[in-house]
Amino acid sequence: MKSPKIRFKGFDGDWEQRKFGETVIIERGGSPRPIDAFITDDENGLNWVKIGDAPEQGNYITKTAEKIRPEGLKKTREVHPGDLILSNSMSFGRPYIMAIDGCIHDGWLLIRDEEKRYDLKFLCQMLGTEQMLAQYRAMAAGSTVNNLNKELVGNTEVKVPSIAEQAKIGEYFSKVDDLITLHQKKCEQLTILKKYMLQKMFPQNGSDKPEIRFEGFTDDWEQRKLSDVVDVRSGRDYKHLEEGDIPVYGTGGYMLSVSEALSDDEDAIGIGRKGTIDNPYILRAPFWTVDTLFYAVPREKHDLNFVYGIFQNINWKAKDESTGVPSLSKATINAVSTMTPDYEEQRLIGEYFSNLDHLITLHQQKCDELRNAKKFMLQNMFI
């Protein structure tokens, strides 16, 4: 293939094939040793780039957690804004653009485009495509060390268009990355808000009132045992059932679908009996749960979403009854003390957190959709 399947309007003609190492400078990083002797808090120290400094989302290294003394410079590799660095671990193998000056250890490769043959954003995206990763894997096949190195990366073949088309492609993917980052940050902010509000809208430290309430509610909350709030029921084995459309849940979430329901019309909260015991989640009827997952059905005058908030506020790990695999019993769950208001206040609190969860889910779904779209476009806008 000499041109990609998807192109911007106005661009045609074949892409040019190049041996990558003949078009850029590729060098391995280095580490002064022992490295601990060179780490410094001095503001005049040199930025020391580690894997942990790379963002989970985005392509730019903008800061480092550590610095090294300038004396270590002769034993390392200096990098500058506009340089690309690539982790030499093939399981990682993701490129980043330096936005700051710094130094890299021998777990990084420096890629410097001195002759400006590439648009920087295009080059960063190209180095992370599945097409490039496939070349890395093929060249490393049979090697005893499954890592990237200067020779391997330099021997790859790349196919590139004009600088103008590169710039268009690079800018397009940069905007997609910005959108993903935006939705991811919104997700994180809402998750932090939810954690904060779970503390503020439920009584803490023996108090009989929460710090934050809806207008019009002033009465004290009443102390209850969870046994007064929910009916904790046991999951059961599903292997005797036929395939169907009733979801089966375990401690990790959805597993498969079967022909019968354990709960036909009562929504509940799933809480692990064994294994993952600190990840409660809402179960919508009809459903089936396996024997390692209890399902707690709210009793009359108790709102499901409010009760879910109670479950999220409990430190379930502290109630682990096993020295091996984490475990809970019905008796332990039933004995937990909690506080509840009247039903109308429960309903409003539950609705508030349900809306928050919905917003978090929407932003996460948007992130997933954008990542899938980006993956498709990377496969079709590069060769």
Question: What residue spans do the PLM features occupy?
Answer:
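Catalytic core of tubulin tyrosine ligase-like
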Residues: W316
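Short coil/turn segments at secondary-structure boundaries
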Residues: R33-I39, M139, K239-I246, T323-V325
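A short glycine-rich beta-alpha junction/loop motif
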Residues: N88, C103-L109, A141-A164, W288-T292, ...
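Structural detector for helix-capping/boundary residues
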Residues: I6-K9, R18-T23, G52, E130, ...
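Non-catalytic beta-sheet/beta-sandwich ligand-binding modules that flank or precede catalytic cores
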Residues: W15, K19-F20, V24, E43, ...
